[in-house]
Amino acid sequence: MKIKTRFAPSPTGYLHVGGARTALYSWLFARNHGGEFVLRIEDTDLERSTPEAIEAIMDGMNWLNLQWDEGPYFQTKRFDRYNNVIDEMLEAGTAYKCYCSKERLEALREEQMAKGEKPRYDGRCRHSHEHHADDEPCVVRFANPQQGSVIFDDQIRGPIEFSNQELDDLIIRRTDGSPTYNFCVVVDDWDMAITHVIRGEDHINNTPRQINILKALNAPVPVYAHVSMINGDDGKKLSKRHGAVSVMQYRDDGYLPEALLNYLVRLGWSHGDQEIFTREEMIEFFSLGAVSKSASAFNTDKLLWLNHHYINTLPAEYVATHLQWHIEQENIDTRNGPQLAELVKLLGERCKTLKEMAQSCRYFYEEFAEFDADAAKKHLRPVARQPLEMVRDKLAAISDWTAENVHHAIQATADELEVGMGKVGMPLRVAVTGAGQSPALDVTVHAIGKSRSVDRINKALAFIAEREGQAS
């Protein structure tokens, strides 16, 4: 049997982290078994589904590189198929037309609730032999079995049982002729030969209804696995107050897809004590039996730690391809300065996100308008003039412009002045970067370049002279 899984989001918003984890688990399970992964867009909610949401889902899947083997399928393009199956069920007696008015159903609901009963349809039209005109409005209901129970072996939670007496005669076609969500899902899983349905625990109550419809159609019943919810680190349902919840927001915030995938796979699944997983290791080790029944807590600090790890361990050339987008968002012209892969090596230790990296690299490529006020006040003082003049001349004299030779020039200046490296290094750092913090000074100056570094030191010396003039 070929394993076939699916990810079936509703395009009513962005791809959130809970949906992304479900997609990841479904994708990993299929890949682990040499199977296929299907993308299906469940867009039957015509009022809330939008093209923008569909695009956001596709963007998120592509950014995470969760490539599908089939699809994307759209339920709105399959309405004829659903209605044909409903018509066949009406003929077979496994579905029936219901003419009950909204007023009757509401009165029935209020009566049942007043008695402390669970609101459910009473089956009036199921047994009715009244004649109705062909154009009289009606819905179509599934004739759910009235005896026995539905038992399925959830691959995460174990056996789950529902009494058929607790299940309603589900509406499968509305008065406007449109099929309902639960019915479309059943026909899709049947037609697409889905063998394993991996989805959120909020779908558990749908499962017995869908199983009963599948059995009425004499269709194979897939294996089900329901994944627990993701909470914030405070134990409450994950929401925007806990940070980003959209996959593409994490892209915008400077996270690598490898970091988010690694974090999501560990939200409810484990393989021993291992924390870092390559994509290949995820595929090799993943199993539903190792997925926890308990809710997971989203910890942004842990995700940030993983992102920092991947920035520094993935090939710099690859990280640079993701950094490029953030550089463009900051409108930085990188034609005059280090290659982005070199920038990743320079700033990787200091920056935990690519957004932070893009926002802190401008001085490598463009001139800064002014020095940081606090850094200049502390380090661009008259006492710094001599160290800056000496190190400027030594840098200008370097014929082989390497980080090592830059280091020698700084060290030689400190040695000749008989001062610590900080007495030379800190004024130099402020002079060439405009601020008081940067990566190691030798590699920073080397990356900025000789001509630009010398020009900036001269600018700093002019700043010191102007400051002296104002003081006098």
From Swiss-Prot:
Its cofactor is Zn(2+). Binds 1 zinc ion per subunit. Keywords: Aminoacyl-tRNA synthetase, ATP-binding, Cytoplasm, Ligase, Metal-binding, Nucleotide-binding, Protein biosynthesis, Zinc. GO terms for biological process: glutamyl-tRNA aminoacylation. A motif ('HIGH' region) lies at residues 9-19. GO terms for molecular function: ATP binding; glutamate-tRNA ligase activity; tRNA binding; zinc ion binding. SUPFAM superfamilies: An anticodon-binding domain of class I aminoacyl-tRNA synthetases, Nucleotidylyl transferase. It is found in: Cytoplasm. ATP binds at K240. Monomer. HAMAP family: Glu_tRNA_synth_type1. Catalyzes the attachment of glutamate to tRNA(Glu) in a two-step reaction: glutamate is first activated by ATP to form Glu-AMP and then transferred to the acceptor end of tRNA(Glu). This is Glutamate--tRNA ligase. It comes from Klebsiella pneumoniae subsp. pneumoniae (strain ATCC 700721 / MGH 78578).
